[in-house]
């Protein structure tokens, strides 16, 4: 009997200790949350499967004290430091190994991301528009990192990243001082954005990116070519605006390319170099000063074709080859006069002839039953001239506004 009593007392004592510890832990957590909110203005959201912490306090210079408080609350998944004006370093973040995402967008004082190396669960890092950030070599040994966004980090001159085997998305938009890029360490990349990297002169290892689907090198005006581009068998979207490419043969060999954006290329006179792009559905050509003919347009272009501000384009002859085209935009083609071939685009839904001053009439509206919108602002067509026209689609809208 006495033995049973002792066992009961022992079990009861253990239960009391557990209850006390539980109450203490709840109080400790509550106090930590209160301090995070009062001292750092933290925003805390704890859902069933996600612990989010947002903080942009001017008191925040590093993460050491913040991390100490956060650990008393739990294991955070997402740390959002966007807009923190005084944050200089991420030192202290290493004490939060449960983090899957660290976001520090527009942190004007951030100069180092010390502490992120080796965080085992991290899948996303975003330091967009943190202009003082120059050294990112400490971003390494992150086995699960999928997305790295350094867009607008204008101080970065080189990229020495190691130990990122899972990296799929690399965003370097507007890193204007970045000189060279070696992609050999990132064979799994799916998206690469270097748009606006005016100082970039070479991209090595491009041809080895067998899984790349999106490539944006627009306004990376220091590049003179894209060696290896023809090997990008999975590429779907390619943006080359304001990048002078001497040889388009590699691009013409991309079997899955669906969207091609180009602009400012002086070498393009016709679309014949692109005619082999059987999967292409959208074609954007902007301000190509010598484009004179649409002959050779890939026949599969159906969702959108735009040839805007091309001063030598005088006729739309050749466009009829893209018989399934739904949206045609020739805005700003000041010398365009002949639009008759549009009548053969039986699937056309919208056309823009804005600022095409030599276009005086739109007889094609009589033959296109799917056409819904004709944009004519600043063209040579006057409103009175379309009154009473027999329309294939009685609900057709003529829009004479000019949008800048």
Annotate the PLM regions:
Residues 1-13:
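N-terminal Sec-pathway targeting helices
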Residues 14-23:
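Hydrophobic alpha-helical membrane-insertion segments, chiefly the h-region
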């Amino acid at each position: 009997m006495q033995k049973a009593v002792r066992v009961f007392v022992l079990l009861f004592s253990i239960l009391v200790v557990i209850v006390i510890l539980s109450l203490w832990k709840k109080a400790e957590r509550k106090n930590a949350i209160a301090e995070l909110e009062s001292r750092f203005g933290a925003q805390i959201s704890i859902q069933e499967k996600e612990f989010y912490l947002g903080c942009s306090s001017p008191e925040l210079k590093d993460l050491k004290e913040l991390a100490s408080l956060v650990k008393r609350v739990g294991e955070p998944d997402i740390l959002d430091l966007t807009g923190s004006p005084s944050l200089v370093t991420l030192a202290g973040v290493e004490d939060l190994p449960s983090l899957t995402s660290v976001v520090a967008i527009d942190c004007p004082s951030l100069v180092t991301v010390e502490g992120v190396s080796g965080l085992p669960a991290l899948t996303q890092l975003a330091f967009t528009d943190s202009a003082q950030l120059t050294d990112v070599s400490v971003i390494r040994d992150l086995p699960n990192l999928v997305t790295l966004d350094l867009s607008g980090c204008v101080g970065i001159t080189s990229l020495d990243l190691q130990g990122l085997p899972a990296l799929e998305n690399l965003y370097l938009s507007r890193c204007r001082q970045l000189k060279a890029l070696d992609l050999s360490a990132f064979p799994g990349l799916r998206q690469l954005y270097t748009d606006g990297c005016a100082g970039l002169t070479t991209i090595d290892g491009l041809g080895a990116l067998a899984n790349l689907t999106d490539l944006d090198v627009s306004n990376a005006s220091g590049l003179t070519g894209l060696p290896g581009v023809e090997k990008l068998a999975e590429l779907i979207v390619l943006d080359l605006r304001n990048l002078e490419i001497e040889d388009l043969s590699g691009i013409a060999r991309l079997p899955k390319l669906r969207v091609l954006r180009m602009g400012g290329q002086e070498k393009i006179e016709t679309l014949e170099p692109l005619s082999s792009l059987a999967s292409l559905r959208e074609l954007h050509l902007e301000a190509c000063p010598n484009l004179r003919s649409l002959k050779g347009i890939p026949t599969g272009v159906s969702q959108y074709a735009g040839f805007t501000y091309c001063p030598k384009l005088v006729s739309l002859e050749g466009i009829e080859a893209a018989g399934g085209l739904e949206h045609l935009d020739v805005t700003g083609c000041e010398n365009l006069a002949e639009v008759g071939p549009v009548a053969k685009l039986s699937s056309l839904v919208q056309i823009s002839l804005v600022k095409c001053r030599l276009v005086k009439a739109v007889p094609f509206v009589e033959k296109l039953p799917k056409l819904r919108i004709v944009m004519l602002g600043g063209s040579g067509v006057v409103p009175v001239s379309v009154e009473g026209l027999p329309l294939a689609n009685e609900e057709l809208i003529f829009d004479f506004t000019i949008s800048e």
